[in-house]
Curated annotation (Swiss-Prot):
The keyword Cell membrane applies. It holds the Pfam family NADHdh. It catalyses: a quinone + NADH + 5 H(+)(in) = a quinol + NAD(+) + 4 H(+)(out). Belongs to the complex I subunit 1 family. It is a multi-pass membrane protein. It is found in: Cell inner membrane. The gene is nuoH1. This is NADH-quinone oxidoreductase subunit H 1. Keywords: Cell inner membrane, Cell membrane, Membrane, NAD, Quinone, Translocase, Transmembrane, Transmembrane helix, Ubiquinone. InterPro entries: NADH_UbQ_OxRdtase_su1/FPO (IPR001694), NADH_UbQ_OxRdtase_su1_CS (IPR018086). Its main location: membrane. NDH-1 is composed of 14 different subunits. Subunits NuoA, H, J, K, L, M, N constitute the membrane sector of the complex. The chain crosses the membrane at residues 7-27, 78-98, 120-140, 166-186, 193-213, 245-265, 284-304, 322-342.
Length: 342
């Protein structure tokens, strides 16, 4: 079956746009991280590279490219290179099923601002995120360094533990919406209340698990400098280290987008239809509103990092297995009871 050229061109443009936006936001998240930490610590932050330090991410990128590529002599070279590649690849793939806006009307055609709206989009995100564990584990093991291996083991156990609670929290959301399509979940919220109204406990569980999945403070045990030097990427340098750091910030961006889409209406602006605007204007405003929500969640990630202390490892595991998972199961029971009664 021949694929229309227009379809290929449309999807190529959307894929390129999503990939580029993800990289740019990841770059400037590093700048925002420093500015937020400076704000909370009564400092100025980066202000040398360009006006207000806005060129600092570009300076960091040049620095990573110029650093020497070092592969330890005792490392498994193939897997050492493969680890950060897997981490970066899985971070970028998750954006394919997120609806970044409604649709644009161009030349009589409706162009959806989504790479693909598969009917199992929720499962796709969990499948891709699960593969990301291999990038961390392979990188830590291939380094042939005890600190790297310990960090990789910590990361794997942490991510697997919190994926269970995250999955259970999404089961309650799927019970409420009746679909696994992310596009349909967002579309339902444009004609009804946002899902945060129906699933406040589910959102809280999902948000906490997102912090753990992204290895962000207070869940940054896999790379805590005080115990493990740098964790699973201790032996990495140059762009291979840059790929791991980029993947972390892209994961933070995608997690913020998923939380916004699942629980806060995605691109939906309440009552915008009463303004009588044309479809393209509504879509553009909705996309800008969606990214505003994402930026607020990214700020929350950074705010928590610079205000809360790190958990001990036993506290981390106890929180995941003894508190978050039972809470998620209780949330499913409550959701089922509400569906039956109301």
């Amino acid at each position: 079956m021949e694929i229309p050229v227009e379809f290929l061109l449309e999807k190529t443009i959307i894929v390129t746009a999503v990939f580029t936006i993800s990289l740019v936001i990841a770059m400037y998240s590093t700048y925002a991280e420093r500015k937020v930490s400076a704000l909370l610590q009564d400092r100025i932050g980066p202000n040398r590279a360009g006006p207000f330090g806005l060129l600092q991410p570009l300076a960091d990128g040049v620095k990573f490219f110029m650093k020497e590529e070092i592969i330890p002599s005792s490392a498994n070279k193939a897997l050492f290179i493969l680890g950060p590649s897997i981490a970066m690849m899985t971070a970028c793939l998750t954006g394919a099923v997120i609806p970044w806006g409604s649709y644009l009307e161009i030349g009589g055609d409706q162009i959806a601002l989504q790479v693909t709206d598969i009917n199992i989009g929720v499962l796709y995100i969990f499948a891709v995120v699960s593969i990301g564990v291999y990038g961390v584990m392979i990188g830590g093991w291939a380094s042939n360094n005890k600190f790297s291996l310990m960090g990789a083991i910590r990361a794997s156990s942490q991510m697997i533990s919190y994926e269970i609670a995250m999955g259970l929290s999404i089961i309650a959301l799927v019970m409420t919406t009746g679909t696994l399509s992310i596009g349909e979940i967002v579309q339902q919220q444009t004609t009804d209340w946002w899902n945060i109204v129906y699933q406040p406990l589910g959102f809280f569980i999902f948000m906490v698990c997102s912090f753990a999945e992204c290895n962000r403070t207070p869940f940054d045990l896999p790379e805590c400098e005080a115990e493990l030097i740098g964790g699973y990427h201790t032996e990495y340098s140059s762009m291979k280290l840059g790929l791991y750091l980029f993947a972390e910030y892209i994961n933070m961006f995608i997690s913020s987008a998923v939380m916004s889409a699942f629980y806060f209406g995605g691109y939906d602006i309440p009552y915008i239809e009463t303004l009588g605007l044309d479809q393209n204007t509504v879509t553009i405003l909705g996309t800008l509103f969606f990214f505003t929500k994402i930026v607020l969640f990214i700020f929350l990630f950074m705010w928590v990092r610079w205000t809360l202390p790190r958990f001990r490892y036993d506290q981390l595991m106890n929180l995941g297995w003894k508190i978050m998972i039972p809470m998620a199961i209780i949330n499913i029971i409550i959701t089922g009871a509400c569906i039956l009664l109301f």
